[in-house]
Amino acid sequence: MAKISKSYSCTSCGLVTNKWAGRCDGCGDWNTIHESKALSNGPQKVSIGIEKGEKILLSDLLPSSKNLSYSKSGIAEFDRVLGKGLVSSAAILLSGDPGIGKSTILLQAAARFGEAGLKVLYISGEEAASQVKLRAKRLGLSTAPIRLGSETNLRNILTTFEDEEPNLVIIDSIQTIWADTVDSAPGSVSQVRSAAFELTNYAKRTGAAVIMVGHVTKDGQIAGPRVVEHMVDTVLHFEGERGHQFRILRAVKNRFGPVDEIGVFEMASEGLAQVKNPSELFLSERGKNIPGSVVFAGIEGTRPILVEFQALVTPSTLGQPRRNVIGWDGNRLSMVLAVLESRCGISFANHDVYLNIAGGIKINEPAADLAVAAAIFSAKEDIIFPINTVFFGEISLSGAVRQVSQVDNRLKEAQTLGFSEAITAPRNKKKPKDGINIRETVNLRDFVNMMHKYKGSTEGLGDGKP
């Protein structure tokens, strides 16, 4: 391991040098150069670990859990994804495509945390402090109580933390940070792992929360070693299509809250605005009397959400028809098509199938199977379903429609937005839900027979606005 040399920093301007001087070359002040605290290289003695460690009972640790504090930013969608808010000592990794809005949402959150009384330190390795300040001015945050810094050397950053003692640290980004104890270029696997370890260790040792921005690869995976995701407490992913104004903040991992929780934001001129009722917004531009359009009642984390599934089935002249999907699992689409063909006798061998989820959101739960089958069947047979109907249910390979979780929450959200009918699997609770008609279907064949009655008819369709 490389030998660590002493470093000195100026308490007035922060200039770092490798030797002491009476006068700072940066600001000109006298007697402001002091030795900086060096980073620990970890255990070096062979004798460490030979003696038996102290036993700690879990019951003795329980009272200390009361010291775990939550801080709310006031941005409800951001706090929702974190759980109850920002946890002290938490290490958080935020990833997303370039230009999706990672720095914007963090700068907005930092400003709100600062206004709430937290001491916030924003370190940018990609922009100068003046550039961050200019962006803050554009977002209307020029007077926010945030301390800004532009640095990439890990030792200098941690020394600054020791001096400032912040409550919240934001590192933008972890791929630009380099440690002088690691003999490799910034952004390499070893550098990212070392920087993440030191920053996470700092959070656990001092009680400060650390948020690190991470780059992604071309296929959307977090760049760098997978071990970083295991180190941190929370992994957030910022997703969305550049052509859409919506941005989805999703919790991929969270030790302090539900996984797959989402926060919905809308890109505006003054930054990212939170969307308090995403279901209503996702359905605001839904057309009426259109084959292939259905509404799915889903659950993302703890939040019920309604989204529109759009399908298009066209004759194909290709030897292998296209199967294109946006926002859903392509393998699961192939399974639904196979079940429709095998169990219901609907052939797609000579047809291209396109599936899209409106608004740019991504759905992962199997409960969307029935909505996908309904959209494809509607597009294939040119059938228009009632616009006031929602669909949800998991489809098995036998064609059976299975029950899904949190049915009451799905129905409540649908009823709130004016939907009067739901088609799903048979429920254990036979008591009907007030205000909404539940139509149960045992298998996909019964569902297809049930929906055939709408062919060539537009009776029962709403006014296009649920």
Predicted regions and their residues:
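Conserved RecA-like ASCE P-loop NTPase motor core of nucleic-acid helicases/translocases
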Residues: V120-S124
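Conserved Walker A/P-loop ATP-binding site and its immediately adjacent core
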Residues: G125-Q131
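Peripheral, non-AAA+ core regions of ATP-driven protein-machinery
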Residues: A2-S5, S9-S12, V16-R80, V87-L107, ...
